[in-house]
């Protein structure tokens, strides 16, 4: 994957939401970078207000990404995989009981945008709903008050599956 493709994906994923609860975001993106030209493999947090990646772990993350995604190899085989960390406490303070739903709504909207951006760039994408919550939080060195994982995602070059062709 090229840096231009990754930039386009991140820009598309972080466009402000137009919803009744729009305002500050509750979901933080963490990227497991495996194969992005010119970007060292590692785990990065994405800061949309600065359009900046901050590396928090160095080295090959393929085994970790797959393992954290309940052993799903596609998280390790993709060019980049994502953990979406939702700040449920802040959402609850802002929106009461509905905050929990708004965090998941935001993660779903980000996932939809990741699908659309990947498809527009000729890449494949898939949401991953199975992951180890506590292991992800520990791996990313997040304290409980920093949020919890709500969704995983992977983007890379598609591998055609003849079983799916009609």
Predicted features along the sequence, with ranges:
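A short alpha/beta connector and helix-capping loop motif
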Residues: 147-149
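C-terminal helix-cap and adjacent tail motif
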Residues: 152-166
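Active-site-adjacent "gating/activation" loops or surface patches in catalytic cores
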Residues: 72-100
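N-terminal amphipathic, basic helical "cap/leader" segment at the start of enzyme domains
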Residues: 1-80
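Short, glycine-/Ser/Thr-/acidic-enriched flexible segments
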Residues: 34-37, 50-51, 60-61, 87-90, ...
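Hydrophobic alpha-helix feature that most strongly marks membrane-spanning transmembrane helices
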Residues: 14, 34, 87-90, 112-119, ...
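Short conserved micro-motifs at the rims of enzyme active sites and ligand-binding pockets
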Residues: 40-43, 92-96, 162-166
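Small-aliphatic-rich amphipathic alpha-helix that forms the alpha element of a beta-alpha
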Residues: 9, 29, 82, 98-138
């Amino acid at each position: 994957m090229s840096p231009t493709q990754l930039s386009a994906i991140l820009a598309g994923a972080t466009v402000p939401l137009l919803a009744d609860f729009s305002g500050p975001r509750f979901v933080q993106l963490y990227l497991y970078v495996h194969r992005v030209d010119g970007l060292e493999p590692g785990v990065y947090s994405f800061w949309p207000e600065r359009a900046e990646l901050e590396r928090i772990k160095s080295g090959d993350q393929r085994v970790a990404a797959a393992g954290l995604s309940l052993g799903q190899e596609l998280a390790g085989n993709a060019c980049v995989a994502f953990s979406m960390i939702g700040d449920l406490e802040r959402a609850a303070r802002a929106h009461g009981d509905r905050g929990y739903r708004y965090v998941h709504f935001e993660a779903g909207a980000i996932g939809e945008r990741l699908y659309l951006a990947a498809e527009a760039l000729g890449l494949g994408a898939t949401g991953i709903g199975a992951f180890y919550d506590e292991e992800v939080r520990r791996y990313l060195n997040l304290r409980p008050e920093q949020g919890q994982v709500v969704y995983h995602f992977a983007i890379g070059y598609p591998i055609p599956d003849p079983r799916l062709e009609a």
